[in-house]
Every structure is written in C-alpha cells, then in structure tokens.
Regions:
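Short helix- or helix-capping micro-motifs
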Residues: 7, 101-112, 162, 166
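Short acidic/glycine- and proline-prone juxtamembrane loop motifs at membrane-interface regions
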Residues: 119-126
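Membrane-interface alpha helices of multi-pass inner-membrane proteins
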Residues: 154-169
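Transmembrane signal-anchor helices characteristic of membrane glycosylation enzymes that use polyprenol
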Residues: 2-23
C-alpha cells in the first residue's frame, strides 16, 4: 500500500499546481451530455455518466464545478495509484527486488505522460489502467492455467477489468479480443 500512497502523493504535488485537474477535450463534451441529458454514442456512456455524474453531484452539493472536477481527478489519481501499486507488487512476485520496486515507484510517480494521464479527465487513463491489469493477469494465466482458473479473485479481477476496459473506450472490445 505504501507504494500506492507514494505515487498518489507525487501526483498530488502536480495536482496542486494544475487544480482542479486537466478537464480537456472530450471531458467538456461528456459533462455537457450529462448536464443537458442529451446523450450520444460518440463517447462511451459509462465514462460519460461516471465523469458527469461525479462533477454534477459535487456541483449540486457545493455549487462549484471546479470542486466536482477536482473530486473526479482525485478519484482517478487514487485508482491509477492503486493499479500501479498492483503492477509493482506483481513484479515483486516475479523477482523485482525492493530497490527496483522503489525506483519503479518513483518513475511511475514522476514520469510526465503517466502523471498527465492520472490528472487528465479523459477516459484514456482509466482505460490504460484496466489494460495493464489485463496484461498482468494474462501473464499469470500463461504461467499456470490451472492455478489461474482455480483462483476466484483473479478470475473476478480479470472479468471486472475486462468489462471496464471495454466500457471506457469503444475500441476496448478490440483490445480485449
């Protein structure tokens, strides 16, 4: 859990500089779909409802759209920090030593594209996180097929991450196949 907290805190430093986060390109359209209740198939409905729902909920409670965007950004930062923590843990299971784990933790916390993905309200960051979980679980599956299918937690995580990956991007189905 410590590595996830470190990554989150490194992201948080940048978050303070770019408060409330990067509400860019698709996010504005997605938010307006929720506000106006006129949905299209251009953006994945799941992400539209998640992003717009969180921003609108916080707006209704506080009167501030910026706080809503910040809430969404912080939740996404937390999710990606936990996913990267899982990634580091899995590499540790495969022999990555503590020193390497800490170097990777720092890299994941300061690598500019990854920091931007965590602070950007576009669907790409969460899609990338689900794809990473899929890759890690597929490696487990390839290493020991019987053990993988006997582990209910892994099967559940595989199913949930696959479904979310497909819900976050229209081309997620193709990535899964």
């Amino acid at each position: 859990l410590r590595t996830g907290v470190v990554i989150f805190l490194l992201y948080f430093v940048v978050f303070l500089a770019v408060y409330p986060g990067f509400f860019v390109y698709d996010a504005q359209e997605e938010y307006l779909e929720v506000v106006t209740r006129s949905f299209t198939t251009h953006h994945p409905l799941f992400h539209v409802l998640m992003l717009g729902g969180i921003v609108q909920l916080v707006y209704k409670l506080t009167g501030s759209v910026n706080l809503g965007i910040a809430a969404y950004t912080l939740l996404q930062m937390a999710a990606l920090s936990l996913i990267f923590r899982y990634f580091i843990w899995k590499l540790g299971e495969h022999g990555l030593r503590k020193r390497g784990q800490w170097i990777l933790t720092l890299y994941l916390g300061i690598c500019p594209p990854l920091v931007m993905f965590s602070l950007c309200s576009a669907k790409d960051g969460l899609f990338m996180g689900m794809l990473l979980i899929q890759v890690l679980l597929l490696l487990d599956l390839c290493e020991d097929v019987e053990a993988f299918w006997a582990d209910r937690k892994k099967m559940l995580l595989f199913a949930v991450s696959a479904i979310l990956m497909m819900l976050f991007r229209h081309n997620g189905c193709y990535a899964f196949l």
